UniProtKB/Swiss-Prot annotation:
This is Cell growth regulator with EF hand domain protein 1. Both EF-hands are required for function. The gene is Cgref1. Keywords: Calcium, Cell adhesion, Cell cycle, Growth arrest, Metal-binding, Phosphoprotein, Repeat, Secreted, Signal. Residues 148-281 are annotated as: Disordered. It comes from Mus musculus.
Length: 281
């Protein structure tokens, strides 16, 4: 019985926070269409963003010049000057929140959680290049461009595309010019490599010839020096001298044969006379 009593007392205490957390009629809610309009960065270059900021400046009725005739840079500088409350040349997070709330969703300032805070975080993440949490006029005007050459990025950094969708830069003239320039560079590189390969055999032959010239034997060096000085005959003169030596050797042989024949002739005469004497005896 005591347990049932405790459960009955605890049940209202558990249901009370849920009842307070549930939305009630009459509580201001942000329009879903307004929430969708808060997602893009209003400082991003584009005709819709510029028109929205021009309408905001036009509604202030504090501008000497008609905002419709102002370009994007003039509009952003005017917004910067209006919301730089401390006049330090920089916009902090609160000043950005005040500017974007007034420009995008004026009624969102009364909400417990301002949805424009997400837009402020996106602006600081995208345009606060030095990461100090402050926006300068240059950072506000110079919106960083999204990299267009996704093909040059590593596969891990490329955004996945749904199946059946074509790449955005498939037929862009910039990509075709880039591919043509890359093809031209590859052709020039191939020609240079082919020319270098054709010159390598000639360079090797030249190196071999120089090596042969450098590695001459001592006899050839001595002969070359003698030929240059005139002491040793050249190849043609040596051949003529060898022919003359051979002719002289032939003549000497002929003289030797004739001498031997002349020496043998008296001996034959003496032998013949001795034989005649023997016959007579």
């Amino acid at each position: 019985m005591f347990q049932w009593l405790m459960q009955a007392l605890m049940l209202p205490l558990l249901l009370l926070p849920l009842g307070r957390a549930a939305p009630k009629d009459g509580v201001a809610r942000l329009d879903p269409e307004v929430q969708q309009q808060l997602t893009p960065n209003p400082f991003q270059p584009g005709p819709e963003q510029l028109r929205h900021l021009q309408n905001y400046l036009k509604g202030l009725e504090k501008m000497e010049e008609d905002p419709e005739h102002m370009d994007r840079e003039q509009v952003l500088l005017s917004l910067f000057a209006l919301h730089d409350y401390d006049q330090n040349g920089q916009l902090d997070g609160l000043e950005l929140l005040s500017m974007l709330t007034a420009a995008l969703a004026p009624g969102a300032a009364h909400f417990p959680i301002n949805p424009v805070i997400l837009v402020v975080d996106s602006v600081l993440e995208t345009q606060d290049l030095d990461g100090d949490g402050l926006m300068t006029p240059a950072e506000l005007i110079n919106f960083p461009e999204v990299p267009k050459h996704t093909e040059s990025l590593p596969p891990a950094l490329q955004e996945p595309q749904p199946a059946g969708s074509q790449p955005l830069l498939a037929n862009s003239p910039l990509q075709s010019e880039t591919q043509q320039s890359l093809g031209t560079k590859e052709e020039i590189r191939g020609q240079v490599e082919a020319k270098r390969a054709s010159l390598e055999p000639e360079q090797e032959a030249g190196h071999q010839t120089e090596g042969k010239v450098d590695t001459l034997s001592p006899e050839e060096e001595a002969r070359g020096q003698a030929e240059s000085e005139g002491d040793v005959p050249g190849p043609r003169e040596g051949a003529e001298e060898q022919v003359e030596i051979k002719d002289n050797e032939g003549e000497a042989k002929e003289l030797l044969v004739e001498t031997l024949e002349s020496l043998n002739t008296p001996n034959e005469a003496e032998a013949h006379s001795i034989q005649l004497e023997n016959d007579e005896i």
